Amino acid sequence: MAIKKYKPTSNGRRNMTASDFAEITKSTPEKSLLAKKSKTGARNNSGRMTVRHHAGGHKQAYRLVDFKRIKDNTTATVKAIEYDPNRTANIALLVYEDGIKSYILAPKGLKVGDKVQSGPDADIKVGNALPLSNIPEGTLIHNIELKPGKGGQLARSAGTSAQILGKDGKYVIVRLTSGEVRLVLATNRATIGEVGNAEHSLINWGKAGRNRWRGKRPHVRGSVMNPNDHPHGGGEGKAPVGRPSPMSPWGKKTAGKKTRDKKKASTKFIVRGRKSK
């Protein structure tokens, strides 16, 4: 996929870029693999806002993507590469030998007509899904499970991948895109290759309106609010924070304070943190 740049016909178009969608081969999604997606306006069941700066956006239909890849001992053919508005990566439409259709994340290099498989005996080939114990060291992988049978949870965004560094008993040592090194059960599955659409991070949205189409609302600084709205608010002119540390809107220390639960069960599987040197 390449990035196209618009002519500066207006202030909003100046420096605006977008995907050229050259890899997309089918514009309409598979109806049998769609589900309804309702907007919540970032409010919960009691009407309270649970996430700031989220609301609106274009109407979308959810694509049912297969993150588990448990249909073994059969071959699927890639029929199309499609756009998915719910994620940064593109998706590939598979048709199995028995006629079943499914979506998977489209890895880099996967093309229409390619054959993919899943299972312990699958080849080490882009798009194939195998248990981590069957994947050789040094291989780039994505869509990695954390619990057997739950489906892939790690390395699913556009352009991301992880690398197998080694094997230690019933665990496999994996280095993630962030630099974090962690242990993952060898029975968990992963897909070979990198997630495609890597240039997505280079897109310049150009104007606020495009972000509104994506469901993003304005992010207002606390320092320009009133003191009853934010701990940084108030004062005459451009006033400092006025506290020993920057604070969140709810009065908790932020900007450097670790928020991960020290007692979280999965901490023991992290060999090296993403910020470790």
From Swiss-Prot:
One of its GO terms (molecular function) is transferase activity. Pfam families: Ribosomal_L2, Ribosomal_L2_C. Part of the 50S ribosomal subunit. Forms a bridge to the 30S subunit in the 70S ribosome. GO terms for biological process: cytoplasmic translation. Coiled coil: none annotated. InterPro entries: NA-bd_OB-fold (IPR012340), Rib_uL2_dom2 (IPR014722), Ribosomal_uL2 (IPR002171), Ribosomal_uL2_bac/org-type (IPR005880), Ribosomal_uL2_C (IPR022669), Ribosomal_uL2_CS (IPR022671), Ribosomal_uL2_dom3 (IPR014726), Ribosomal_uL2_RNA-bd_dom (IPR022666). Residues 212-277 are annotated as: Disordered. One of its GO terms (cellular component) is large ribosomal subunit. The keyword Acyltransferase does not apply. Residues 254-277 have a biased composition (Basic residues). The gene is rplB. It comes from Leuconostoc citreum (strain KM20). Keywords: Ribonucleoprotein, Ribosomal protein, RNA-binding, rRNA-binding. It comes from the Bacteria. This is Large ribosomal subunit protein uL2. One of the primary rRNA binding proteins. Required for association of the 30S and 50S subunits to form the 70S ribosome, for tRNA binding and peptide bond formation. It has been suggested to have peptidyltransferase activity; this is somewhat controversial. Makes several contacts with the 16S rRNA in the 70S ribosome. SUPFAM superfamilies: Nucleic acid-binding proteins, Translation proteins SH3-like domain. Belongs to the universal ribosomal protein uL2 family. The lineage of its organism: Bacteria, Bacillati, Bacillota, Bacilli, Lactobacillales. Disulfide bonds: none annotated.
